[in-house]
Regions:
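Active-site and adjacent substrate-binding regions of carbohydrate-active enzymes
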Residues: 1-276
Length: 276
């Protein structure tokens, strides 16, 4: 649920109290936003699998007919980040095999259809919900995965790239699509319409850095994670080159670089680099 707190951690009232106390202490609160996919337990997806083919509910996600004589094969050759096809077939209410849905990550994380204006409108409401509660911004998970090439075509080089991408080569059909930038510009307008300083940081695994810089232009994200720096070996010359490349790329668009050394996907640097 994008508009509630997991009961494991408390209630919305607890959240409001935390935000108020944090602000008293001069701290800022960013909400972690996951826009590429929902849980398969989310009411939107439950409505989608209960809905008919071609319904408005299914249009929230990427549902397609399978290939093969009986639709038994995935709709395209995309690979999940966790292995295997990026597609799972549902079972219809009458027990017959149904359509397939796209999930770039786990099968329990169906990808939303960001070409659908209803999805865009829903998330604008989610942003406002948290901004109205006083949060200072958002850390946006996997924004580079939101857009998909029209028609969801096969990956032309899946044998080499797998579920990822090859730096310096054309973007694969499931990553880095230009269609996401108008969405981020609209989000930035929403943040800028609120008083005070609000920030939007993207966990966008986009390389090279000159390409990543396009995501932090003045009307899009305020910052992105600097994965070039995060992935750099802990050697002086490599770090020196990474820092210089970062300044050059981000200065070109008037944005600050970030100096992140670990996150929830990367072992903490004290352990990774600390040795004894």
């Amino acid at each position: 649920d994008y508009q509630d707190v997991d009961p494991l951690f408390g209630t919305l009232a607890d959240f409001d109290a935390m935000v108020a106390r944090a602000h008293e202490l001069g701290l800022r609160i960013l909400v972690d936003l996951v826009p590429n996919h929902t849980s398969d337990q989310h009411r939107w997806f439950q409505a989608a699998i209960a809905g008919a083919e071609g319904s408005a509910e299914r249009a929230f996600y990427h549902f397609k007919e399978g290939r093969g004589e009986h639709g038994e094969l995935p709709p395209n050759n995309w690979v999940s980040m966790f292995g295997g096809p990026a597609w799972t077939r549902i079972t219809n209410p009458d027990g017959t095999p149904g359509q397939w849905y796209c999930h770039l990550f786990d099968s329990s994380q169906p990808d939303l259809n960001w070409e659908n204006p209803a999805v865009q409108e829903a998330f604008e409401g989610i942003l406002r919900f948290w901004l109205d509660r006083g949060v200072d911004g958002f850390r946006v998970d996997q924004p580079h995965a939101m857009g998909k090439a029209a028609g969801l075509p096969d990956h032309p080089d899946v044998e080499r790239a797998g579920a990822g991408f090859i730096e310096g080569e054309p973007s694969p059909p499931m990553w880095f699509q230009e269609s996401v930038h108008p969405i981020f510009r609209r989000w930035r307008q929403i943040l800028d319409s609120y008083p005070g300083d609000r920030a939007m940081c993207g966990e966008a695994y986009v390389l090279p850095l000159s390409f990543m810089a396009l995501w932090v232009r003045a009307d899009e994200f305020h910052q992105t994670f600097n994965f070039r720096f995060l992935d750099s070996e802990w050697r002086p010359q490599i770090l020196f080159n990474s820092i210089n490349e970062s300044f050059e790329a981000f200065d070109a668009v008037g944005a600050p670089s970030t100096w992140v050394l670990s996150n929830h996907d990367i072992i903490r640097h004290a352990t990774r680099m600390g040795g004894e």
